[in-house]
């Protein structure tokens, strides 16, 4: 019986590996993913807030009411300038010709700061700034910021941790998924921008 179970388990693993290999091969042949050695792209991707404060807009707040926004932590796959493509739970590639102008964590922090500042009319400081001492602290983990090949979708997921000036800690997960996205830089870049703005808006509303 154990031998039969072992054979079934081995067959299942082989089938999963074959499926992942076929999907990766299809994406590679169609020019959707890159495994390294590619030529530099003609343009770079960035994130742009859908709303921004007008020039001359002034805000003020007591130190305990200001918000110190820290750069989010990211997994190794996101600590680069490339857009990850999730083939399955065990396989990862990078999207061809999709390169960020800055690391995703930096871009998302800047987008989030502008959204919170605009939507909540709050003073937002950069985490680590001496002026931010004693302020409310917002940290987080940007766990997903890329393309899911099995769903043909971009996924942005941010786990926020808020430390209030009263010492109370709150946590919340925010996520945006946009399906039906083609696996190319021209489609994935704008879709990630929309999803990132969606998540940033969710966070801003949570903080109100």
Where are these regions (language model features)?
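C-terminal motif of bacterial Sec signal peptides marking the signal peptidase cleavage site
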Residues: 28-31
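A structural "domain/chain start" motif
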Residues: 33-101
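Structured segments of extracytoplasmic/periplasmic soluble domains
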Residues: 75, 110-122, 198, 202-206
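Bacterial N-terminal signal peptides that target proteins for export
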Residues: 5-22
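Envelope-exposed proteins and targeting segments
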Residues: 63-65, 79-81, 88, 96, ...
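Surface-exposed short loop/turn segments
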Residues: 33-47, 114, 118-166
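Short secondary-structure boundary motifs at beta->alpha junctions and helix caps
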Residues: 91-99, 167-201, 205
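Solvent-exposed coil/turn segments that connect beta secondary-structure elements
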Residues: 72-74, 88-90, 143-145, 159-165, ...
